[in-house]
């Protein structure tokens, strides 16, 4: 039991008080010259330009600390002010610095994964670092029911902060994130849907920060699905070598099953061989299985309770639609048509 319980303990590396001191440290620019990060994609990544570099953030903070917040120039009277400064510029710059440093744990985990595997395709987009790639199998003939789960569920700002608390214990950093989210104008409308504007987690001016928050949210949301795929003896994973997040969350879910089964024995039989298939395509989680409608309905309510009680991810059963795969296979067909499959050459020799 102790072996399973240890997975509930957060990784010590992920619990370091790293974020807030680094942002306001005098020598934050040293991050831009770090050897480990430079040899990967943090510096050369698309979108990581001079506007969001650690050096620029350091200079910005130094400039803010030297200025008098009560002095407002007459030329800037029409500009929006935040603590006496240009709100749009300064809050955006600090949010960029927050994101750059917040991505360090994910990047370092990628570095350690590469050192073990020695070979990995170079990523040109930071979104893929902490976004779990969908599980894929080519054969769907054995599946008969599919559940569509619309994601992301409209996220409240506090739920976003609570999600980050699972791997970041630095209270100062969480307060800074909460301050940025609530102080920046119209950020609530980007996360909480309004009648005039649909829900969206991505901001054009602060896309990097919102992608980081969104992927952290989805990473928690999807953890249970990859556990189910690995549990199924009929659906071995075909693309799990470089997905270091899967190992981390798989340990957590496995421990939860072992510990929770003592208090809730009926839960254990759900995990024996779920025979499930999961993909994420166009904002939906598609979960297919060779099961009866009753079993799929049980899974629907179990997943909702699991997300709400253990991952602080709020969802509702009405957002999960169950259909027969024969009448609802368009999502799978569209997903497969957009994925480039690597054909393998098989050589055969006839025996005389």
From Swiss-Prot:
Q: List the Pfam families hit by this protein, alphabetically.
A: MatK_N
Superkingdom assignment: Eukaryota
| Keyword annotations | Chloroplast, mRNA processing, Plastid, RNA-binding, tRNA processing
Where, per UniProt, does this protein localize?
A: Plastid, Chloroplast
**Chief location of this protein within or outside the cell:** plastid
Which first-to-last residue range defines the signal peptide? none
UniProt keyword annotation of Iron-sulfur present:
no
Q: Which GO terms describe its cellular component?
A: chloroplast
Q: Which InterPro entries match?
A: Maturase_MatK (IPR002866), Maturase_MatK_N (IPR024942)
Q: Which GO terms describe its molecular function?
A: RNA binding
One GO biological process term: mRNA processing
Q: Which family does it belong to?
A: Belongs to the intron maturase 2 family. MatK subfamily.
User: What the protein does?
Assistant: Usually encoded in the trnK tRNA gene intron. Probably assists in splicing its own and other chloroplast group II introns.
Query: What PANTHER family does UniProt report for this protein, alphabetically?
Result: MATURASE K (PTHR34811:SF1)
**What is the name attached to this protein's record?**
Maturase K
